[in-house]
Regions:
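Acidic (Asp/Glu)-rich catalytic clusters
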Residues: 6-8, 37-44, 61-74, 97-107, ...
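Active-site neighborhood of phospho(di)ester-bond hydrolases with catalytic His/Asp-centered motifs
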Residues: 13-16, 49-54, 75-79, 111, ...
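Distinct, well-ordered alpha-helical segments
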Residues: 59-67, 88-92, 96-99, 123, ...
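H/E-rich (His + Asp/Glu) clusters that bind or coordinate divalent metals
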Residues: 183, 199-358
Length: 358
């Protein structure tokens, strides 16, 4: 018997929140293409969505190349910042230009990590800065889906509550040099007031699991806004602590909630299986199981309609029932434009993949 639950194939499940952290894994002698294909097939997903990260210039290229290799895959593109903090607008690298390039290539949506406090500080531009205005306007007009990481758990601003592991990862924000927890939300409030029909999914339950009433108000106000249930484990502890309320919440707002795990390549294998097992059990079964912070959770065992909404229907409704096809010529132009911003090693690996897939 398998140690972890596998998704029933008839669910047509879509993994909405994956990443690529490197192009190649030495241990398994595997590229990210093989790694994510293993993940998709091993766990019985109908489709997966890879969200690019502004780590380096090659991340968008890798996501697009994965879509070429696996045309049933989705991908969300991201902005690349050649310098930080941004002192001025860089011609040809502004958000609107980059957005249009990514849409021409055939990305299915956009990913922004810019709301994570450490990256927010590094870039040096508030989320509601006029630098992004044209992009938000075009995004709203086009009804393009945005997967948006905004904030982190509130305890990351409190030195007495943030754990050492998170401090070591650079996730303590209470030294006075970072925008406050509430300050970041205020920036989003201004964006949403200005663009109320923006098709946006806030990752990690918008870090509002302690204040779900805030989400309820936003759901009533913004028709195309939702959240995903990608761990942070802290949200699942809040679900436990308010079990009956949250089970009703998930049923009532099942059309605003999407499945995701935040799994990455090359950190695959057992860790990915463990994450999906916990998330799926929580929404789809009434199992009691050990999960986040070694807490014993009890699953919500949501009704069929609510489960299907969360597991695949909401993604299809907001992103698309079928992925967009990659425009290979547009991708070649993008690689040519950005290749000088990559290391020699990245260039070599991307070139090898281009020779195989383009």
């Amino acid at each position: 018997m398998d140690k972890y639950i596998k998704l029933p194939k008839e669910l047509n499940a879509i993994e909405g929140h994956l990443h690529i952290h490197s192009l190649f894994e030495k241990e398994r002698q595997m590229t990210f293409i093989g790694g994510h294909e293993w993940y998709k097939n091993e766990l019985n997903f109908r489709g997966i969505n890879i969200a690019a990260l502004p780590r380096n210039a090659s991340n968008n290229m890798a996501c697009a190349l994965y879509k070429v290799a696996n045309p049933d895959a989705y991908a969300h593109g991201c902005f690349y910042y050649p310098v930080s903090p941004l002192k001025e607008k860089i011609e040809g690298l502004d958000p609107l230009t980059q957005y249009n390039e990514l849409m021409e290539i055939g990305f299915d949506g956009m990913k922004m990590l810019e709301g994570k406090p450490n990256l927010h500080k590094l870039i040096g531009r508030d989320l509601n800065n006029k630098y992004f205005d044209e992009f938000y306007t075009e995004l709203e007009k086009d009804k393009t889906h945005l997967l948006f990481h905004v904030n982190d758990p509130d305890e990351f601003w409190d030195e007495t509550k943030v754990c050492q592991e998170h401090k070591d990862r650079g996730w303590f924000y209470g030294d006075g040099t970072y925008t406050s927890y509430e300050g970041i939300y205020e920036q989003i409030d201004e964006i949403m007031e200005k663009h109320p029909t923006l098709c946006v999914n806030f990752a990690h339950f918008y870090f509002k699991s302690k204040r779900p009433q805030d989400l309820e108000k936003m759901f009533e106000k913004y028709p195309n806004m939702g959240v995903d249930i990608t761990p942070g484990g802290e949200m699942y502890l809040s679900f436990d602590d308010n079990y009956d309320y949250y089970r009703s919440f998930f049923i009532k707002y099942s059309e605003r909630i999407q499945l995701g795990t935040d799994s990455t390549f090359p950190d695959g294998g057992e860790a990915c299986k463990w994450l999906l097992d916990r998330v799926y059990r929580y929404i789809a079964t009434d199992d009691s199981f050990k999960g986040f912070n070694n807490r014993i959770h009890k699953g919500f065992n949501l009704p069929k309609e609510a489960k299907e909404n969360i597991i695949y229907k909401n993604f299809e409704r907001t992103v698309g029932t079928e992925p967009k096809k990659i425009n290979k010529e547009a991708l070649k132009r993008y690689i040519e434009k950005y290749k000088h911003l990559m290391s020699d090693d990245e260039n070599a690996k991307i070139q090898q993949l281009c020779e195989k897939y383009l």
